[in-house]
Amino acid sequence: MINILELESSLGFGGQEHRTQRVINGLDKSKFKVFYGLNPGSKSLEKQIECEFVEFNLKKSFNIFEILKICKFVKQNNIKIISTHSGKDGTIGAIVGKICGVSVVRTRHLQLPITSPLPYNLSTKVVGVCDSVCADLIKRGVKKEKVLKIYTGIDTQKYTPEFKINMKKEFGLNDDVVGICIVAVLRAAKNHKLLIDAFSELNLEKSALFIVGDGPQNKNLHEYIKDKKNIFMLGNRTDVSDFLGSLDICVLPSEMEAIGGALLEASSCKLATIGSDVGGLGEAVSNGKSGFLFENGNKEELKKVLERLILDENLRKHMGEFGRKYVKEIFSIEKMIENTQNLYMELAK
């Protein structure tokens, strides 16, 4: 049995915490036992995760008393691998690993520049969630031989073309209306306003835009769309997989993005996708096959590809079909679990 200690200092439950949940739940329980070290009050404590939760104080990168406490836990529980994800826990995990002589896997989920390569280079292996993230890590000083890509996996059995909720019908729209969506936290970097402007300026009949998510830009965006037609804000939804298949196009116009899991989930539901050409979105969207990429911030280019997909039903269907195959082949949750288990088995030798 290989005992693993996951550490996560983040209190929220976003994309990277979803990935960690999928990995933990997918690991072969006859080979791996997982302890999940979290801050008190972490939202992950409320989730269905097949592990043993442990509360640590991970609010500071260097707290000698907490580091010694974690070292004691590692030795008492025969931990073979420490897995870290965020800035503070990444530094703590790297230090504990060196003190205890335990392998450390640091996963980088974000496209944002790292502040220092040191905690990464102190780790045994550094996992990037896409080629773009891996390349940026190496560019910023992380040793190339430590870096390994493991794509974020999508649950293709959960995200399917079938749907329980018809979102068009929910808003009194006919089935021939082309449903466009963006599924993202409402923050400025996601560039919602660019999509809203592009959609509104096209002003095409039989099309509607659904904005799914919540966040700091909620009030601003409600105000921004109040005089615009056929734009609906759904707020935060926990049932996205139940209605995504009832829509037709998914757009992510982010200024910065790692892998863009929302686009992969949409492709798994056979939606055509559109993404800005930043970070790992060029990997999430197979340009010209599962959807289109457009130049970051270029509204006219976004309008062009959006109009093309709204007006061409056959193209949408063709791209949706290709997209699901593409996700199942490259971004399946099974492949992510397999690659992660292989890494852990190698490090535990």
Question: Where are the regions that the model predicts?
Answer:
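Short hydrophobic beta-strand element within catalytic cores of glycosyltransferases
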Residues: 38, 272-275, 285
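N-terminal strand-loop element at the rim of the active site
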Residues: 6-66, 215-217
